[in-house]
Amino acid sequence: MIRFSPCGSRRASLRLLLLLAVSNTAMATGTAGTAVDAARLAAAGTETANWIQHGRTQDEQRYSPLSQISGDNVEDLGLAWYLDLGTKRGLEGTPLVVDGVMYFTGEWSKAYAVDARSGKLLWENDLNVDRDRGQYGCCDIVNRGMAMWNGKVYVGTFDGRLVALDAATGEVVWDTLTVDLSRPYTITGAPRVVKGKVLIGNGGAELGVRGYVSAYDAETGEMAWRFYTVPGDPSKPFESPILEKAAVTWDPSGKYWEVGGGGTVWDSMAYDPELDLLYIGVGNGSPWNKWIRSPAGGDNLFLSSIVALRPETGEYVWHYQTTPGDGWDYTATQHMVLADLEIEGQTRKVIMQAPKNGFFYVLDRASGELLSAENYVHVSWAERIDLTTGRPVETDNSYKTSPVYQFPSPMGGHNWQPMCFHPGTGYVYIPARELAMIFRQDETFEYNPKFWNVGMDVMKDLTVPAWLDRELVKKVGAATAQGFLLAWDPVKQEEVWRHNSETPWNSGALCAGEDLVFEGTGRGYLDAYDARTGERLWHYDVQQGVIGSPITYTVDGEQYVSVLVGWGGAFGMSFGFSSNTRESPSTEGRLMTFKLGGDTQLPPVDRPRRLPEPPADTATSEQIDKGNQLYHKYCVYCHGPGGISHPNLADLRYMSAETHQMFDAIVLGGAQRERGMPAFSDTLNAEESAAIHAYLTRVGHRTLKAEQSRDSTWTSVKHWFYGVLAAVADWGVRMIAWFKSAAG
């Protein structure tokens, strides 16, 4: 459904007037993207006023030379305008700005256009995404952005479509399905346009799909080519000769094709017009567990690889695999940056990536040759990368027979949040984290087409007993999950500086001008740093966590910085303990834009109310235990361990009396489908739903008791003691990591 501002009437005459008004607005500020073609995309670096494509330029450096805002005056940055988006889900997008109009996406792949000067809404289109597909989302109902070409903007939708919209009006030009809806595919990544073709990948490898990237004609929506990243059923013809070669790196006894094999291209791409090479990042296996997926071993190409293709045909050129035979969800879908670096006295055309596995890679982007690799965060799965073979020298990291405590966790040393490259400093700025996990074999694994199929017993480590104090869970969890903005020298392969972000789940980075780097934090601030020293120069309270990536642009000669504000995503959904739900209250997601001297004020935040009285706790211990297990199997990925959700999702410890009464209608009947909560009637029965409800009721009573005594001396002492335990836990984690590294 499309809406125009300021009026939503559907009468034809008024609709025509609104269309004319929107078109006139676009013409007044530019051409609404009608002139964006191959030449303009290639020359995007010279258009300092605009942010035409996802990484601003085709090399994905996310650097803007705009310098009106500088280290000398950034402290004068203030809010110019904001736009409430009416959502409390994660906002991961990078806006585009073309000729005075800003385009961006929100939750459920909703598309928006606003006046980049004032924030006035020009149009919005919710694209009618099937809300039932929400059950297939590993990592929230997010979207990371758009692409633009010849008067159209392109959006990949959560339910697997690629949609072209008229940039001036938001009307659908064409709409094509890119996935098999019988499989749990989703799309959250931003498309790219190269040589008149729209490129889009997909996600879903946690549940079980086969990955690929597709190219569509930008004018007609017809598919031009498709490149599968992993082989299919070996008894059937291979789609290309390279897949026949890749198939020998898989063990067919694992019947990987039944689950899917994985290898989704769910985020990063880059393009070099001189070499005419498209680079795609390939994800993890389906299932994660390589001993289930490919029992005899093998590299399992092209999982966790950077692959170079010809953009006109999809022809394979080269690949580099960062994690051969990945068994830990160490994807190589993370942001890739192209640059020319002076290495050993020679200028090398390189591609750089900091994938999940914790190593920073510098490759020759023409050939795929590995030039250097060093760990940018603590790793324990491998000692180093052998520069002769290009392969990791692995430690004893097998969890086939016994659990392994390992760095990084599946959240990675770096996830989808884009890094940026500053050509002035020569440094890359990485939204990094250090977080470990216990990897253990799922001894009872059986493929379930409606649920996660990772082949690891993740639930055992996420399950929180009903009796355990949630404040202790939160403090220990937060203390052992570190996040920071890391300045990295890609030539010397060493850390320059880091700044603690206080949470491991933050925004992408923006490099700007001579000396600035911007990053938003999960604690609810937008920060600016000195790019050379790491000194924080500006610290602005945006009222909730930031995971969207900031951009900068100018209109009428005035520079702005914009960012989408709304916490969520994979970590934000699953690990509510990383944010204090009382001190980080829920607010609606917003688009926020800053300029020098901006004086707009955000409305005050309403603090959460006290916990309502839960219904009577009459369940048996057997019911509570059953509910605990079921909750941590089916509910934990969205609602968090022990019911501790992040601030912007339903915290099930705080259910109202009405929600308690409607529990079965919500869980089994889909009463909250439009808000992203699908019906689980095909997964749970009434008895199981009642057990989950009983467990959450018990948790609610314990939370209420804690709330009622939170101002007491005993509570203060207890929380102090929990803080000490959390510090000890953090120290213990680091000692384990150190000893494991020393032993390796």
Task: List the model feature ranges, each with a label.
Residues 38-39, 606-630:
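Electrostatic cytochrome c docking/interface patches
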Residues 156, 623, 661, 681-738:
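C-terminal capping alpha-helices of c-type cytochrome domains
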Residues 30-79, 234-244, 391-394, 473-475, ...:
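Blade/loop signatures of beta-propeller domains
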Residues 436, 551-608:
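Blade-level signature of beta-propeller repeat domains, shared across WD40, Kelch, NHL, RCC1
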Residues 83-94, 124-147, 175-190, 228-268, ...:
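Extracytoplasmic beta-rich repeat domains
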Residues 200-212, 253, 280-300, 434-478, ...:
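Short, conserved, GDST-rich strand-edge loop motifs in beta-rich repeat architectures
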Residues 51-55, 90-110, 135-161, 186-207, ...:
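Repeat-blade elements of multi-bladed beta-propeller folds
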Residues 628, 640-673, 678-679:
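Gly/Gly-Pro-rich "capping" loops immediately C-terminal to redox-active cysteine motifs
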